[in-house]
Amino acid sequence: MYRSHTCGELRPAHAGQEVTLAGWVHRRRDHGDLIFIDLRDRYGITQVVFNSANAAAHAVAETVRSEYVLQVRGKVRIRPAEAVNPDIATGEIEVDAFEAQVLNPARTPPIYIAKEAGEDESVRLKYRYLDLRRERMQRNLILRHRVVKFIRDFLDAEGFIEIETPILIKSTPEGARDYLVPSRLHPGKFYALPQSPQQLKQLLMVAGYDKYFQIARCFRDEDQRADRQPEFTQLDMEMSFVDQEDVINLIERLFTELCRTVTPHKRLLTPFRRLTYAEAMERYGSDKPDLRYDLELVNLSDVLAETPFQVFRSVLAVGGQVKGIRVPGCGHFSRKQIDELTEVARSGGAKGLAWAVVPTDGGDVRSSFAKNLAPGEFDALAQRMGAQPGDLLLIVADRPVVVAASLDKLRRKLADLLQLADPDTLCFAWVVDFPLVEWNEEEQRWDAVHHPFTSPKDEDLHLLATDPGKVRAKAYDLILNGYEAGGGSIRIHRRDVQQQVFSLLGIGEEKAQAQFGHMLEAFEYGAPPHGGIAPGIDRLVMILADEPTIREVMAFPKTQQAVDLMTNAPSPVDERQLKELHIRIVED
């Protein structure tokens, strides 16, 4: 028996018992006749005392170093009052060792295990098996386990069936890039790794499995950002005979109970707020706004419709917008700070940032633009924005898409600077009534906002042929603290409607049959009305764990360049393997 107890288990009630522990040497303190070793496993830390009176055990303790794997036998005893450590669960006891054995020595680790030392992330990822020994990483992975377990238990109680869908599927290159897998048995043909089980879960609805879920691994070959990975995990769900409200109500119950159970220290705001897509874009410049703070966008276009200020006037003349954000009490910002905010706005596409400080003493306005306005225009602008003395007003004039992107970035930056977003608050919301399609100016075509299987609203079906841009989708996104937590929709379940949407997206009958023929045929055999959603597990756990990226809540993530530094994947393969797959590498 390697251990009778874990390193986080022993308490004063165990005093006098002989125990066997095994773990890693966390810290070692040599006081000559007494050597103290903090022995660690994933359950906690126990202090072990080696007395020179037990010469053999003491001799072993003299040789061990950090991260040695050690087995110890000894007797539990109560620590002296002055030696109690309130920072660990076992802090009232220690183990007096009478026997010890090194199970495996260890080289000096390239990273500190006992504490965060600010190493470059590349070092942490290269030695991930060491990084995962740290308390922070263990805490994150245990939280992830608890989240997934809660979801499984909740959905099982709701009558859902967990069904695994294939990892090797057909490539349908309509969204992000697929990861392709060559077939040895079928030369020149390829499987794709699933970007999501979307089509398969809809086919399960046709098959009669009316409540399906899966903790699904998904793959997308796309450019990486802080919250993206080439492979990720989502809670994939689908239900038959449901409408939008049925899905929303179930998910709201799931996440409310999940957060209250798994992260009870967090303040969960309920009921979940609800915004239309148009409202979210108008008020926040984003379809995933962080609603823990205000800083709403204010439309000033009508107030400035007749302005003589050429910068605003020229933008409005070509259908642009002028919008602003009021930053309460921040009129004291320095010019350097305002210049930094200007760069943030420019990162969203804005050509610049107009600013003004509302005077506190009835004096002149300090501003980059107010002197160019007509008499009374600044007062009207300030009134529209609800400005108070000492407020800072920030304004962008440009095309609506640029105004939205710039002010969204500005809003998030201000919240960060002013510490407006409480990390212990969870603010979920639903964004609904998305457009079904959006115009792709570069390709001169309509693209699906979500995916081509999203159902149009019944009352907008007649617009598909005449005014597609006005068609609203039966789509709903769950957002959390400024992130998209999950996207869902009611799906198309009739072949004629699906073909009409394919046609709108430029997918002709021949192409539709080649790529989606299995779906179209299935719809002819009694497909029920159905819908679902797919919340991201990685992102949810990232937010619950207060981590900056999903890499901190995944066991073995890739870098932002999609490289596994630990195993050096991707890597070359030998010529024999390529030949078996009928593949030849062609140099650029």
Swiss-Prot record:
It catalyses: tRNA(Asx) + L-aspartate + ATP = L-aspartyl-tRNA(Asx) + AMP + diphosphate. Coiled coil: none annotated. It comes from the Bacteria. One of its GO terms (cellular component) is cytoplasm. GO terms for biological process: aspartyl-tRNA aminoacylation. Residues 198-201 are annotated as: Aspartate. GO terms for molecular function: aspartate-tRNA ligase activity; aspartate-tRNA(Asn) ligase activity; ATP binding; nucleic acid binding. L-aspartate binds at E174, R220, H450, R491. Homodimer. Belongs to the class-II aminoacyl-tRNA synthetase family. Type 1 subfamily. This is Aspartate--tRNA(Asp/Asn) ligase. The lineage of its organism: Bacteria, Bacillati, Chloroflexota, Chloroflexia, Chloroflexales.
